[in-house]
UniProtKB/Swiss-Prot annotation:
One of its GO terms (cellular component) is cytoplasm. The lineage of its organism: Bacteria, Pseudomonadati, Pseudomonadota, Gammaproteobacteria, Pasteurellales. The gene is rlmH. Specifically methylates the pseudouridine at position 1915 (m3Psi1915) in 23S rRNA. Keywords: Cytoplasm, Methyltransferase, rRNA processing, S-adenosyl-L-methionine, Transferase. This is Ribosomal RNA large subunit methyltransferase H. It comes from Haemophilus influenzae (strain PittEE). Belongs to the RNA methyltransferase RlmH family. The keyword Amino-acid biosynthesis does not apply. It is an enzyme of class 2 (transferase).
Length: 155
């Protein structure tokens, strides 16, 4: 199973890239973790936000292909680390690749939300989207370590 994080936004600060890549490189070869960045639509004072969201959503879903779609969204389901580890096992047993979607400044398109089979909430807080990349990478690595009895996770 491959996990792909599909996120709106490019040109992240160096600390985001460093943090994400630190956890990305730790993933085992049988569970590659990939990042696909979708360029954000141009936003100005007269921007058509609905159209921008639609374009970003189409690009995200095209990048996902036939993978299982999981959105990262405040109204989603919050998971503890053990629950995320269970989700990881369920995703592996499903046999499909998994695509995790992080929207842009206005969130995810209605189409992305409609196609999603699951929605995961990291927090009831609104988090900066660059930070979400690092938190997701670490959380998934921690969940993987729990499923394999790797010493990274400690109760």
């Amino acid at each position: 199973m491959k996990i792909t994080l599909i996120a709106v936004g490019t040109k992240m600060p160096s600390w985001v890239t460093t943090g994400f890549e630190e956890y990305q490189r730790r993933f085992p070869k049988d569970m590659p973790f990939e990042l696909i960045e979708i360029p954000a639509g141009k936003r100005g004072k007269n921007a058509d936000i609905k159209r921008i969201l639609e374009q970003e959503g189409k690009a995200m879903l095209a990048a996902c292909g036939k993978g299982k779609v999981v959105t990262l969204d405040i109204p989603g389901k919050p998971w503890t680390t053990p629950q995320l580890a269970e989700q990881l096992e369920a995703w592996k047993n499903d046999g499909r690749d998994v695509c995790l979607l992080i929207g842009g400044p206005e969130g995810l398109s209605p189409e992305c939300k409609a196609v999603a089979e699951q929605s995961w909430s990291l927090s009831p807080l609104t988090l900066p989207h660059p930070l979400v990349r690092v938190v997701v990478a670490e959380s998934l690595y921690r969940a993987w370590s729990l499923t394999t009895n790797h010493p990274y996770h400690r109760e």
